[in-house]
Amino acid sequence: MMARRTVDFKKLIEQLRARATDKAEALNTVSQLEIGAVDAQDVTASAVRAFVGALPSSGYHFGFVRQNVVFYLLSHATVQTARDPLYAAEQLHEQLDRFLRHQHDGGGDEDRLPFYHNGATLTAFQKLLQTLREIQTVIAEQSGGTAAAADLIASNNASTERRGKKGGSSSGGQQPLVRRVITQLETAATEARPYVNCRAVAELLDLTYQRLIYWACTLMPYVLFRRDTDTELDTVLLMHFFYTHYRSVNGDLAVEFQNYVKNSVRHMSSFVSSDIDGDQKPGAEHMRDVSYKLFVGNLQARDASGLMFPIISTRISTVNLYLSPERMFFHPGLISRLLSEEVSPRANLDAYARVCDRVLEDHLHTPRRVQRLLDLTQMVMRLVELGFNHDTCAAYAQMALIQPASQKSSLFVSEIREKLIQIIYNFYTFFMCLYVYSPTFLFDHRRRLILEQHRSTLIGSKEELQHVWSNVTLNVNTHFAVQYTEEDFEAHTKGATEAEREYLYRDLHSKWGVHLFTLRPSRGAAGAASPLPPLDGVTRSDILRECALVNLNEGRVNYASLLAFSHHPEFPSIFAQLVVVTEFSEIFGIPQGLFQAVGSPRLFALIQLCRVLLPEQVTLYQNLVSIYNLTTFVKHIDAAVFKTVRDCVFDIATTLEHLSGVPVTPNVDLLAELMARSVAHNLYTTVNPLIEDVMRSSAGSLRNYLRHTRLCFGLARGRARLSEDGVTVYVEVQGQYGLRVPTTRFVEQLRELVRRDRLLAENLRGLNERLLSVRVRVRQISSDTEEVSRHAKGHRTVAQMSKALKKTASKIKVLETRVTLALEQAQRSNGAVVTAVQRALAVFDVLSRENLERRGAQLCLTEATSLLHRHRALAPMTWPAGTGVAAAAEADRALREFLEAPWESAPQPPRLRMTPDTDHEESTAGATSVPEVLGARYEPAHLAASDLLNWYIVPVSQAQQDILSSIDPPAGSTSVSLPPASP
């Protein structure tokens, strides 16, 4: 359970009163507030008076706190714990104002510290609160669609014609209002710049910026982005995109979409696939939702039926015809194909390559430094026009993540894939940062965590993508250039003493971290940094003796005796070696279960020691504070948090080696436990989604392929015989089932079997690659633990975690191998069956009407006979010995369903009776000279075999004449009975 970040203000005041005469203890007490925070709801006017009265009158920065208590409390108060942070801030202002009204001197020196004295700080805080309240009221009213909101829109955009009321596509009229509110907020942030590092001010700005950004980014009406040149496919994809992601301002699209589909349904059939396995083609899983809505003509429909329906095609040749290239990012199926490189080498990708080049050039290769929030919102609109928002970028990033690092594709296809990854990763991190952006130190921490965490997730150990992440980092730091400069600090602290500057800088450093400038002494500053006793006859032995007595087991800092030695030239080295290194090692050897109760207080005491006795080691202090905050107040230890703690630990070890002059090996007990939590969190948040994606993307294909394999096995076990008249196929399944199937239908289904085998093999090609991506991700997680492992050889927890990760990777590898072998075996056996089927179909193809007409009966019959002879020469197909009865029964059942289901009521080919009228109709109807082999045929007369023998005996000349003439008797004549044949 994580500790409460805020301190008990009343309890802290009581501690100050009890230790008022001990300045060191007073510093320890207020440090709790400065490292943690005070809940703004606990601050009352009486509590502030008690706090000021309990502080020592001199020493350290106590004088600054007493004279500028309003600034001090705003700097260390938090409003995040309140249900309504802005209301809590307003109540805080009221209490501080009440406190000042009862102060006799008003506090502070207006001439010496014009920004930080109580009056100026409270006035600026009040003005900021008023502005933030106005802005949040506008946002709430706009989101709620109240009458006041309508009035505001009308006043800001009276000339704008809107297409509808709330829920319609009318937010284009709100853009002027958005720009006005953004300008108002940026002006307020600029005016509050001297106080932007006060925690309460930073949290309020942070909250308002995020609400404003979210509101502005939801106002994306379809009418602002559609074009007259959009194709039918463009229009369908755009309507679905804007209705799905921006429904609040595109409510009328539901009706518009329904009418559009109804009027354009004939044109839309060209870019959908009606194949039975259309939803299993590469990239098709990402088109299922929009395809279903197109199929039913309703944007509000949800696919819960489980039925099959036409899927919008992801085939490059089809997409090229019906999708505008600049709309490519609205088609997730296309992006999935390009990322997976499921592209024919002959596919025309030039248009998509040009779009990628243009996006990279316009947005990423030469980024412009963003100075205003308005610039960011304008960039969002440009990205939405391309088809990007937070959700689509997250989906595309996941697509890229599950793809292997390298594939055997053409160089051009691989280049497009790399460009897509660069675009996707850049815009994904852009939106991740955008929705948590504010010009404060709070965002600076988030930005670093986002970059660190997503570098581990998206790039990992893929060396070929390291340059992509360098570009991502450059663009994020350019688009979100948030910092507090040395010029700002000098302007705001003009007139402060050196002790006050040191306190203010240390406070800044604890909030901004290593990105902050280095403090230089001010020429005009007065006063010492801390009250040091005189140094009289202090020796190295004295320092050694005092340092040896330091014990932080009780979590309290008693450094009064050491303070006299702290400016001795040898003190930093001795103190670091005897105290800091020892405490540092012992603290990080405390188990995580005891760390909150034992380790955290000792770490806090060590922080205080370093702050007072090693004031120049600001980086050491900052790293200790970072570890304290992350291990004490952060609930979820993800990869970014673990890496931050790990880096801080090793940075501290390096600093202590430099100070003490002796090698420092950090204790990794706590790091090992944090690593275990980080790995578990990482597996849950990054590997599990990959496995779920594998199951979701491949489960359907695997089920279909299993049914297909059973069917092929059933065909191998069965025997088929063609009837004498060629109309019917008789099928025996191991002599148990007798099936009678029309030949035409039988041939059609065999062709479907061959086609499905090809499609299923194509769909399963990416399964092994997805399994490989899971194994690669586990390997990346393992690499995150390597640095700790190098310093903890033989450590039990580290060894167990490494063993578990290796075991996980090994199991995934075994699964990958088993799946690969099973698929290869199935493909070989299925391939043998399909090859046999193709040989049989080849005979029917050779004897097709088109072939007979083009090549003649003699050549076709000769070729068909040759095919039959070659086929009969092959060994009969067998199945593995020991095949289970259940498996054989399932295969036989699959074959029976395959043959019976479509044809139980199928019509037989028509029969023609051999009559004079029939022959006359055939000869005069202009029919083709060659009939279909499997088409309508004559039905012979039902005569005994003896009646059919010797019925036509004539001289050769007569036979030739009869063959060349019609067998129809002349009209009006009667049939002539033939004389019986002579023996």
Swiss-Prot record:
GO cellular component entries: host cell Golgi apparatus; host cell nucleus; viral tegument
Keyword Ribosomal protein in annotation: no
Region feature Interaction with large tegument protein, mapped onto this chain: 474-983
Comp. bias intervals (Basic and acidic residues): 914-923
Keywords in alphabetical order: Host cytoplasm, Host Golgi apparatus, Host nucleus, Virion, Virion tegument
Region of interest: Disordered: 901-932
Subunit structure, interactors included: Interacts (via C-terminus) with the large tegument protein/LTP (via N-terminus).
Protein name, per record: Inner tegument protein
Organism expressing this protein natively: Human cytomegalovirus (strain AD169) (HHV-5)
